[in-house]
């Protein structure tokens, strides 16, 4: 069993299913939109999972001090889904650096793009070595072609990698621009009842790669489609 938030893109849960593990979904905090620490603790005690996949949703970092303390005390591995959080920070440390393994996305709609694909990050060399092996069709290190286990073609081309690396120098500029866009929307909609934006904790700095908000139908006179127009 592997825990993950229900508020996430389907790829988070798919990664769990790919290895025939069972995803257990947990609720998110209504203000920060990241995983609820209370829900996480209850799920750990009830389901005794092998791992927890945290999700830095819309660039918002999770509370990793609390998560790591809780998970470490129950021998639960933390995997950080930082697909949306390149350039985001938690206590002045970059998202993508908190899990035993972490992933970043370079999909076409992300803050830096290679048109697709992403990156696996880990301080554990064995994890990286195994990932490189699997992503190149699990070919054994022989002169001839020999494969003893199922592999995948998850390689990124050198050209696309160069495109991504070229954008890294401007990452801070991109983050500042996205944060400004978020603040402009927040200001423009501040007088509309029932519109709520994600709350950024003082310990976090989001890249705000995607500006999102919720609408309380009991308080708002406008619906989603009207606000989009």
Where are the predicted features?
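Short active-site oxyanion
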Residues: 1, 116-117, 171
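Active-site PLP attachment segment
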Residues: 97-135, 158
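Alpha-helix termination/capping residues and helix-transition junctions
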Residues: 46, 95-96, 112, 153, ...
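Conserved active-site segment immediately N-terminal to the catalytic lysine
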Residues: 80-114, 143-148
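PLP-dependent aminotransferase-like
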Residues: 1-73, 77-82, 89
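Residue-level detector of structured alpha->beta connecting loops
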Residues: 48, 75, 99-100, 193
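Glycine-/small-residue-rich active-site loops that bind phosphorylated ligands and cofactors
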Residues: 31-32, 59, 110, 203, ...
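PLP-dependent aminotransferase class I/II
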Residues: 38, 42, 51-55, 64-66, ...
